[in-house]
């Protein structure tokens, strides 16, 4: 029994030394390489330096408002988003983006961007990992999978599936995890949490029933799983997360691979008939956008299979 522990310690020591050597090697190769904001130096398989978008920013909280009207957790997240989307985003001012007083034709819908979704997911994983208890000499601990199983059973209503309301109740167990404050208005932030929970469910909902089995739940919150960067499709063009387009006085935003639009009455009238007609027109338009998106994704899957 003792020799197994010594062997395990030896393997850990070897892995640690190897990791230290890799860090020193990377530091040496990247010593004189400047990558610019939102990018970091990495070493290729050939041992050459290259600049890539930052994989993960440090989670320190210093909100800034970007020139695109989005609030970011810190400067690093803003520049990382600019790098990933290939767009030019500058810091407009420190702090959360200010809420517009009046509703104007350019008002945007409340949406959960991929950066919001990934930040919520990161916080949940960090919270769950903090509950891991290693096995002791005379006691059994709790691993990551067992902790997830405990929460899954606690919030499942008995159908062996977590829907969005059950998932949201699970997330609300941790105050840090739900404290996403992109908007100045608290009601919008509450709506944002629900939208981001839906976005998390969509990540691993393999049968598209908007409910997660335990295996889907496990995949969604697997620390080694990297959520894909999804884009929106429209008229044979693809748009990055955060891209916007206008239809009359309404604005549509690309968020987590889906188009989300406002439903405003463009002639300024508040009559019920006009409002209903405007909403119906926007519903049809959003459906058209989603059809374009589904067609593009199907074409992509077919192309992948052919390759």
Curated annotation (Swiss-Prot):
Residues 232-286 form the VWFC domain. It is found in: Secreted. Residues 47-99 form the Kazal-like domain. One of its GO terms (biological process) is endothelial cell migration. The modification Phosphoserine is found at residue 164. SMART domains: FOLN, KAZAL. CDD domains: EFh_SPARC_FSTL1, KAZAL_FS. The keyword Glycoprotein applies. Its main location: secreted. Residues 1-19 form the signal peptide. InterPro entries: EF-hand-dom_pair (IPR011992), EF-hand_FSTL1 (IPR057020), EF_hand_dom (IPR002048), Fol_N (IPR003645), Follistatin/Osteonectin_EGF (IPR015369), Kazal_dom (IPR002350), Kazal_dom_sf (IPR036058), Prot_Inhib_GrowthFact_Antg (IPR050653). Pfam families: EF-hand_FSTL1, FOLN, Kazal_2, VWF. Homodimer. Interacts with SCN10A. Interacts with DIP2A; DIP2A may act as a cell surface receptor for FSTL1. Interacts with BMP4. Interacts with CD14; this interaction promotes TL4-mediated signaling cascade. PANTHER family: FOLLISTATIN-RELATED, FOLLISTATIN-RELATED PROTEIN 1. This is Follistatin-related protein 1. The lineage of its organism: Eukaryota, Metazoa, Chordata, Craniata, Vertebrata. The gene is FSTL1.
């Amino acid at each position: 029994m003792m020799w197994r522990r010594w062997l395990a310690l030896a393997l850990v020591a070897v892995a640690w030394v190897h990791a230290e050597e890799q860090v020193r090697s990377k530091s040496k190769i990247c010593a004189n390489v400047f990558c610019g904001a939102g990018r970091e130096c990495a070493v290729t398989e050939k041992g050459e330096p290259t600049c890539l978008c930052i994989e993960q920013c440090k989670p320190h909280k210093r909100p800034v408002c970007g020139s695109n009207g989005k609030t970011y957790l810190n400067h690093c997240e803003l520049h990382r988003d600019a790098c990933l989307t290939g767009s030019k985003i500058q810091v407009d001012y420190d702090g959360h983006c200010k809420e517009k007083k009046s509703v104007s034709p350019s008002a945007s819908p409340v949406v959960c961007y991929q950066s919001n979704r990934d930040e919520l997911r990161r916080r949940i994983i960090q919270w769950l990992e903090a509950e891991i208890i290693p096995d002791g000499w005379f006691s059994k601990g709790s691993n990551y999978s067992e902790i997830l199983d405990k929460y899954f059973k606690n919030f499942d209503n008995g159908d062996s599936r977590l829907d969005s309301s059950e998932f949201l109740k699970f997330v609300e167990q941790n105050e840090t995890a739900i404290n996403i404050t992109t908007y100045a208005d608290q009601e919008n932030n509450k709506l944002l949490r629900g939208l981001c929970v839906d976005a998390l469910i969509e990540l691993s909902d393999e049968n598209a029933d908007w409910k997660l089995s335990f295996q889907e739940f496990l995949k969604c919150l697997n620390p080694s799983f990297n959520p894909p960067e999804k884009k929106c499709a429209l008229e044979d063009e693809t748009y990055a997360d955060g891209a916007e387009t206008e239809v009359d006085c309404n604005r549509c935003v690309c968020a987590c691979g889906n188009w989300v639009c406002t439903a405003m009455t463009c002639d300024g009238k508040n009559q019920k008939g006009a409002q209903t007609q405007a909403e119906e027109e926007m519903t049809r338009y959003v459906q058209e956008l989603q059809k374009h998106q589904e067609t593009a994704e199907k074409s992509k899957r077919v192309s992948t299979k052919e390759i």
